[in-house]
Amino acid sequence: MNGRYSPSRQDFKTGAKPWSILALVVAAMIFALMAITSWQDNETNRAILTQLRAINIDSASLQRDVLRAEAGVVANYRPIISRLGALRKNLENLKRLFKQSHLVIGNDFSQLLDKLKVSVDTTDAAVAAFGAQNVLLQDSLASFTRALSILPKMSSTDQTVENSNELGSLMLRFVRQPSPALSLEISHELDMLQKASGGAEVPIRILAREGRVILSILPRVNDAVNMIQTSDTAEIAERLERKCLEAYSLQSVREQRARIFLGSVSVGLCIYIISLVYRLRRKTAWLTRRLDYEEVIKEIGVCFEGGGATASSLNSSAQAALGIIQRFFNAESCALALVDHGDRWAVESFAAKLPEPVWEDLALREMVSLARADERASVFRIMSTRKVSCLPPETPGVSMLLAHKSTDQLIAICSLGYQGYRLKSCPGEVQLLELATACLCHYIDVRRKQTECDILERRLEHAERLQAVGTLAGGIAHEFNNILGAILGYAEMAQNMLRRSSVTRRHIDQIISSGDRARLIIDQILTLSRKLERVTKPFSVSELVMEIAPLLRVALQRNIELKFKFDDKKSVVEGSPLEVQQMLMNLCKNASQAFTADGQIDIIVSRIFVSRQKVLAHGVMPAGDYVLLSVSDDGEGIAETVLPHIFEPFFTTRSCSGGTGLGLAAVHGHVSALAGYIDVTSAVGRGTRFDIYLPPSSKKPVSPDAFFGPCKTPRGNGEIVALIEPDPVLREVYEDKIAALGYEPVGFKTCADLCNWISKGKQADLVLVDQSSLPENQSATALHAAFKTASIIIGGSDLKMSLSSDDMTSALFLPKPISSRTMAYAIRTKIKA
C-alpha cells in the first residue's frame, strides 16, 4: 500500500446529471403552473349561470307582460315581443356557452336543453296566438263596452235597459271568470236583447256581435294566457342551473384534488431537486476535499524524499508530514504512535510540534485492545485531551484518535488535538485521516527499511572487510603461534630451571611477558577471524567488573580516576567473561589515551528497558530488556568524520604512537559474539561514551573460578601422553612441557606412527595431536577408536571435523599458543574424564 488515493468514477457519481436536474426543474415548474392554473372556464360557467338566470327573468317578465296585456293595462305588445326575443337569444347563447364550457355534458343536459327549446317554442306560439286574439278581444270589449254604455240612452223601453244592465253584469263576470254557463247565459241575454230592441237596433246589433266575439275569443285568449303562465321554461332553466352547479361543484372537487396532487408533486420535485443540489454541492465539496487530500499526500511524499536514512532525518520528515496532516484537518496538534501489538508499548512516537507528547498508557492500551478485538480495519474514538496525553486534569480540548494495524507487529495510533470542543467529525473525514495515517506509516516503514538496508549494507561491507582481514590474519596468526609456542615453551622451561632471582631470570620473565603480550595481539587477530573457541556460561557483569577492577586500575595511568556505579538489579548475561574483560580493557585503554592531563573514566552497569526500537550509531536495536555496560570519559572526544570508522580493523588515529587499530574492532567482535549491541556518542572536547547492550539471562550465575580455575597448576603422576607433531622443534618443546608437568611423553611424527606403536601392544593414557597431522573429514569418534583413548587437538580453532553429541567427550580442542598451565589443565581434565 502506498497510501495514495485517486478519485474513481464512483467518487464522481452524484446520483443525477445536470441535464436531469434541469428536466426535474422544468417538470416541477410545469406541475406548479398546472396546480395554480384553473382548469375550468369560470367565465363561461358564470355566463351559463347568467344566461339561465336571464331566461328565468325573461320568462317571468313575459308572463307579467302577458297578464298586463290581457288586463288591457298596456296596449303596446313591443315589450312582449322583446322579452320573447331576449328569451330566444338567451337560449342560443346558452347552447353556444355549453359548447364552449369544459363541463361534462351528458344526456341529462342535452334533454334539458331540448326541453327548454321546446318550452320556449311553445311559449312563442302561445304568445303569437295571444297577441292576435287579444287585440281582437280588446277591440271587441271596447266596442261592447261603448255599445253597452249608449244603449240605455237610445232605448225606449225599460226592459231593454234592464236587459243591457244584466248583460253588462254577466259579461263582466264572464271576463273575470269565463265559464260555459255564463257563456250560455250571456248568449241568451243577447238573444233576448235583440228581440226587445226597442228602437236601438244599432247598439244592440253591435252589442250582440261584439258580445258573441268576446264569448268565442276570450276562452282562446285565456287558454293562451294559461299556456304562457304555465310554461315550464323557468322550471327547466332552474333544473338546468342546478345541474350546472352540481357538475361545476363535482368538477371543482376533482380539479381541487388534481391541483393538490400536482402541487404535491411539484413540491416533492422541488424538495428532491433541493436534495440533489445539496448532495451535488456536498459531493463537489467532498471531491474538492479529496483533491486537496491528493496534494497533502504529495506533500507528505516530498517530506520523505532525500534526507538520508538516519534517525534524525526520519524524525524531521515525520514531524513535517504530521504538520501537513495537522494543517489539513485544522487541528491544534497532531501526533503518531507506533505501538507494539504484543506488549502494547509505544515503539516509536512522532509529533508535529516539539516536544513530543507523553502518551497515556491507559489510552494506548485501550485503543490497542479495540484494534485487536475489532475485525474492521480501524477504530475511531474521541477522547478528552488529558486522557490521551499526560497533561494536567484542567487541560481543555478533545482528541480524535484513530487506530489501525500498520503491520503484523505494529498498530498505528494517530491523534488530532482540538482546542475547546469545536471538533466536528464525519465518516469522510475519518476515512481521509485513516488514509493519511496509512500513507504516513507507509513512508515511515519505507524510510525505516531503507535505514535498515543501509545499516545492513554497511555491516555486510564491514563483515566482508573483517572476513578478508580475518582470513589473512588467521593464516599469519597460525604461523606466529607456532613460533610463539616455541619461544614461550623454552622460556617457561628456563624459568622453571632458574628458581633464584638473577639477571637471567629477569630476562626470561621479560621474554615470557612479551610473549604474553604477543599472544594477546594474536588473540585479537583471531577474534577478528572468529577462530577462537568460546565457552559460554551465565555470569554477573557487575561481579565481573568488581573482580577485574584492580586489574583495570593497574593498567591505567595514575592521573586517570576510575569510578564504578552499579544498580541493585540483576545483571546476568550468558557468554564468556574473558570477552567482557577484554572489552573493558580495550575501552579503558582507548579512553586513557584520549587524556592529555588528568581525567575520569566512569564504568556503569545497569538494567534498562528500551520501550521502542532504537537506532544506534552502528545498527538498530529492537525494543526489550537489556543489561547496559557504559564506559564514558571526559577526554578529547572523537571527531565526527572519524566516528563511522572506529570499529574497522586496523583503523587507528595513533599509528605513530603504536596504535594497532584492533582494540575497538575486537570490542565490536566480542559484542556481536554476545548477541549484543554497541552505541557510541561523542563530542569533540567533551568526551566519549560507549554503551554496550547485552541480552539478560534468567539462569543462575556461576563464580569466576568456573572460567579462570584455581591458581595452582595440576601435575601428573607419570601417565603416558602420546604426542603427534610433524615439526621436530615443536615436538621437542611439547615433550619437555609434558615431562615438566609430571607425565611421560612419547612423540610421533604422524598418526600412522602412533597407530603402529599401539598395534605393538602399547597404550597411551592421552593423545595430543596437532591439527595439521589429522586427515580431512575425519570425526573425533574415529580418532577415539583408532587411538583407544581420548584426544586433545592442538590448534583446533579452525578445525573442520564433524562432531556428534558424543564427540565432545572424546576430543578437546586447544588453540595455539598453549601455555603450560592451559596444557596442565587440559591433560588433567581429559585423564580424569
Swiss-Prot record:
Residues where Phosphohistidine is found: 478
Residues in Histidine kinase domain copies: 475-698
E.C. number(s) listed in UniProt: 2.7.13.3
4-aspartylphosphate: modified positions: 770
Subcellular location as annotated: Cell membrane
GO molecular function annotation: ATP binding; phosphorelay sensor kinase activity
A GO CC term attached to the entry: plasma membrane
Domain called Response regulatory: residue spans: 720-831
Predominant place of localization: membrane
Record-linked InterPro entries: DAHL, HATPase_C_sf, His_kinase_dom, HisK_dim/P_dom, HisK_dim/P_sf, Sig_transdc_His_kin-like_C, Sig_transdc_resp-reg_receiver
Membrane association type: Multi-pass membrane protein
TM regions (residue ranges): 19-39, 260-280
Catalysed reactions, as listed in the record: ATP + protein L-histidine = ADP + protein N-phospho-L-histidine
Function text: Activates VirG, by phosphorylating it, in the presence of acetosyringone or hydroxysyringone.
Protein name per Swiss-Prot or TrEMBL: Wide host range VirA protein
Organism: Agrobacterium fabrum (strain C58 / ATCC 33970)
